[in-house]
Amino acid sequence: MPERERTSPQYESFHELYKNYTTKELTQKAKTLKLTNYSKLNKKELVLAIMEAQMEKDGNYYMEGILDDIQPDGYGFLRTVNYSKGEKDIYISASQIRRFEIKRGDKVTGKVRKPKDNEKYYGLLQVDFVNDHNAEEVKKRPHFQALTPLYPDERIKLETETQNYSTRIMDLVTPIGLGQRGLIVAPPKAGKTSLLKEIANAISTDKPDAKLFILLVGERPEEVTDLERSVEAAEVVHSTFDEPPEHHVKVAELLLERAKRLVEIGEDVIILMDSITRLARAYNLVIPPSGRTLSGGLDPASLHKPKAFFGAARNIEAGGSLTILATALVDTGSRMDDMIYEEFKGTGNMELHLDRKLSERRIFPAIDIGRSSTRKEELLISKSELDTLWQLRNLFTDSTDFTERFIRKLKRSKNNEDFFKQLQKSAEESTKTGRPII
């Protein structure tokens, strides 16, 4: 669906201001706009104050937010910051929602007015754009559940630089495509956060037009900052470990609805999630008890919503896709975490396993080549690559030494194409001399 040229004033969005400016630069902007008490504000509050001051200066108030919390009476609220409830939320009337057939998760842009004396929220005066498209055009979109899912058939090339060995190995062993539903199985301290950063940067290089989100559930605040600074092309949505489980659930559900609305208009959406385990733990605390309990204190009813989140990933026949790569935590010492992984095992069409033994020996990337694979990989890679890959898998021995030799050989090649040539050459020599390929 082509984007219409905007006719409203061009203000930088919250996401653009937050990503493109440091706190020092924002403070300078605040000084220029003659804001008061800006030194007491954190970065997010500072961005909102600057946006408000810029619009007030021009006599216009144009804001955007994600529709959430549609009430029984039909009205709703647009969330302006991090998909969470806040004081800068915007009220949208039931008539506007009905007229433009706006659904939960839609990004709505339009003219707003400041709250009056007895009001708490901004009020939306007119709807200009829905998901950055003409609001009238978006009314014609199909429903997500009516779209036909297919296996991924358009590859996401993760190999970008010679030194990025993690993504190079993924390209060889677990190729991914648009619409992939992948599980990254990770024990503690195996390098999952570094891997997610490398995957995110590789995706933004290969698929710059795709909408990339990173969802952090129950992670540390410093990891949020690290990812926001490391992956400029991604929108980082987070609910840190100090937030209540209800907040984890609300943020994850709203982001999923946002992704679905984009897929409905033909967009390619990618969500990197850390972690599905902590989301399942949050649901286990939030849902009413079913009276049944699995090992580790896990209520089986709590797994329905996390599985629905993960299961939403799909390649769409008519165009558009939703890719979800989620981490699952294992070997944490918690029986519940192991049970959650067991329930999710086999639900994806790609699994990448990280190995604690490799990480303890300081062998990085700590990828367990033998246990990692992609379903229907023949739709993503050429026949010659597939033949070489199967030849490699046949040689695999369940030992860290094999993986170490594999990584050493990979590091001696300029790129994966060169690596395949070296393998084929080694295979020919092996038939003559009997020496191992790796």
Model-predicted regions and their roles:
Residues S39, E45-V138:
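N-terminal "pre-motor" subdomain/linker immediately upstream of P-loop NTPase catalytic cores
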Residues G59-M63, Y165-I169, L255-E257, F309:
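Phosphate-interacting basic helix/loop segments used at nucleotide- and nucleic-acid interfaces
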Residues I102, K114-I184:
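P-loop NTP-binding catalytic core
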Residues M1-D58:
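Basic helix-extension-helix modules of the SAP/HeH family
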Residues A190-G191, I199-I438:
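P-loop NTPase catalytic core
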Residues P175-L196, G218:
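Glycine-rich phosphate-binding P-loop
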Residues L26, L46, G76, S93, ...:
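Residue-level signature of catalytic and energy-coupling elements of molecular machines
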